[in-house]
């Protein structure tokens, strides 16, 4: 996730890199950690490896995400989908809904918003046969936490887990922040 300092000063170890490299970077970290454990350089323990990416990062980082799925790394890919490249002023992504207005898909006499259907990333990840795939909405936090706990268990025991959330962006969606829960639920 690309944010400015100090908002990335988390209280856990993290790597902040280009958003298209998340799955490749985390795959390498997982493999390096596993080798260190095999050589007894790190004690065995419970560590959860999580990649956080937006739908734009999954668009341009899809190759490395599919590679991580192929290798079935014990990690979680968490995608928050707000329907566009929001860090660049709401350019359309493959997750932008059909007909939506963005800075690169206009509405008017000659243009009708985004002209093609969105990519179904959960279905794409399901086609890789990874152990766990779930979709959640930020408007339902109990379901979100339940599925996140399950993703952690699957990542630890079986391999790659993919979790996608529909996430609101009031600024670029043109909604009021207090209406986002009802917008997501709709």
Where are these regions (language model features)?
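Active-site metal-binding loops of divalent metal-dependent hydrolases
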Residues: 54-56
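Thiamine diphosphate
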Residues: 1-47
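Glycine-rich ThDP/TPP pyrophosphate-binding loop and its adjacent helix/strand module
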Residues: 39-50, 60-76, 80-186
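Flexible, active-site-adjacent loop/turn segments at secondary-structure boundaries
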Residues: 10-17, 58, 83, 90
């Amino acid at each position: 996730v690309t944010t400015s300092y100090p908002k990335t000063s988390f209280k856990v170890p993290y790597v902040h890199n280009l958003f298209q490299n998340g799955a490749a970077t985390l795959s390498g970290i997982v493999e390096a950690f596993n080798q260190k454990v095999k050589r007894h350089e790190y004690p065995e323990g419970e560590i959860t490896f999580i990649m956080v990416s937006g739908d734009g990062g999954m668009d341009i980082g899809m190759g490395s995400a599919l590679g991580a799925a192929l290798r079935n790394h014990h990690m979680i890919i968490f995608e928050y989908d707000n329907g566009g490249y929001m860090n660049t002023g709401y350019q359309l992504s493959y997750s932008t809904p059909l007909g939506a207005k963005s800075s690169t898909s206009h509405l008017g006499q000659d243009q009708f918003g985004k002209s093609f259907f969105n990519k179904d990333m959960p279905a794409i990840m399901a086609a890789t046969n990874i152990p766990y795939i779930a979709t959640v909405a930020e408007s339902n936090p109990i379901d979100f936490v339940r599925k996140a706990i399950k993703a952690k268990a699957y990542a630890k025991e079986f391999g790659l887990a993919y979790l996608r959330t529909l996430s609101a962006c009031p600024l670029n969606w043109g909604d009021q922040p207090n209406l986002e829960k009802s917008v997501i639920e709709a």
